[in-house]
Design a protein with these regions (language model features):
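Flexible, low-complexity extramembrane segments of multi-pass membrane transporters/channels
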Residues: 1-299
Length: 299
């Protein structure tokens, strides 16, 4: 078909006829591409359905293990680490949090798609079957809209038939495996949600520990400067310098308190924003899969 399109100029047709024929060839190529795409999707779907029961069971088992495992407090796990080391772990956990949010979004998408698939797929299959019947009638009659079919337009209709047939096969397989895919989505959702809840708490506890260590360092500095000021009582120069250091240390302590407060507020705000973003994504997904459905028209 691509060769026919490449050599269309060799037919030396009038410009209008050549454009019409070019359109037929391009549409036929597009239909062949759609058929191949749906056949690939069908093969991928069959593999997904083969793997899904095992993946569902693994997710359920991992969730059971996770819920049965004791949570070791952050203060116990990381008590000996320095602030920079804790900040590195905090950064890594924040990255993990983003990955879990993506996984949760994917699981939600799988569930929502499975919930709305029966109506959408059955409607599409019905419309596709009607179109195949129309094409069969056209091919049998040898005419389309009163015009006799040419070999090229006949090939286009045959390509459309094959493309629709591949789509019907895909939708039927989706319907047959729908409950399997929904079970997988539910298992993944429950597992990722548990991981997300635990990770959110760990991030909060890490931030609290970082704040505590920062404050302890500042307090240690203040105490040290106060002791030096007491020792320098006999020297006016040293006393003045020590007094200045005490003031600076006190400022450091208050600044640390403020930094900790702002950091904690920022963490809470970011987690709230992540929650809102997750809700928006879920809503967008629901609207997307419901577009054109009877259910949406009733809402």
């Amino acid at each position: 078909m691509q060769q026919n399109l490449d050599k269309i100029a060799e037919r030396k047709l009038p410009e209008a006829d050549q454009k019409a024929l070019q359109q037929v060839f391009e549409q036929t190529l597009g239909l062949i591409g759609n058929q191949e795409d749906n056949e690939r999707k069908l093969a991928d779907l069959k593999q997904q359905l083969t793997d899904a029961p095992k993946q569902t069971l693994e997710a359920q088992r991992e969730l059971s293990r996770l819920k049965g495992a004791p949570v070791i407090p952050v203060t116990q796990r990381y008590a000996t680490l320095s602030v920079p080391q804790l900040e590195q772990i905090f950064s890594e956990r924040t990255t993990e949090q983003g990955e879990l949010q993506k996984a949760l979004s994917d699981a939600n998408s799988l569930i929502i798609t499975a919930q709305t698939r029966p109506e959408r797929a059955q409607t599409e299959i019905s419309a596709s079957q009607n179109r195949i019947q129309q094409i069969n009638g056209i091919l049998k009659l040898g005419k389309n809209d009163g015009k006799a079919l040419t070999p090229d337009t006949r090939n286009q209709l045959v390509a459309e038939q094959a493309s629709i047939g591949a789509l019907i096969n895909l939708r039927r397989q989706e319907l047959a495996g729908n409950s399997t895919l929904q079970d997988l989505g539910n298992a993944r959702h429950d597992l990722v949600l548990e991981k997300t809840t635990r990770l959110d708490q760990e991030i909060q506890d890490l931030q609290t520990l970082i704040n505590q260590k920062r404050l302890a360092q500042s307090q240690e500095t203040v105490t040290k400067q106060s002791l030096e000021a007491q020792k320098a009582g006999g020297s006016s120069v040293l006393a003045t310098e020590s007094a200045t250091n005490v003031k600076l240390s006190d400022y450091l302590l208050r600044s640390t308190d403020r930094l900790n407060e702002l950091t904690q507020q920022n963490l809470k705000t970011r987690q709230q924003l992540d929650s809102v973003t997750q809700s928006d994504q879920a809503l967008d997904e629901q609207i997307s899969v419901l577009k054109g459905s009877l259910l949406l028209s009733k809402i």
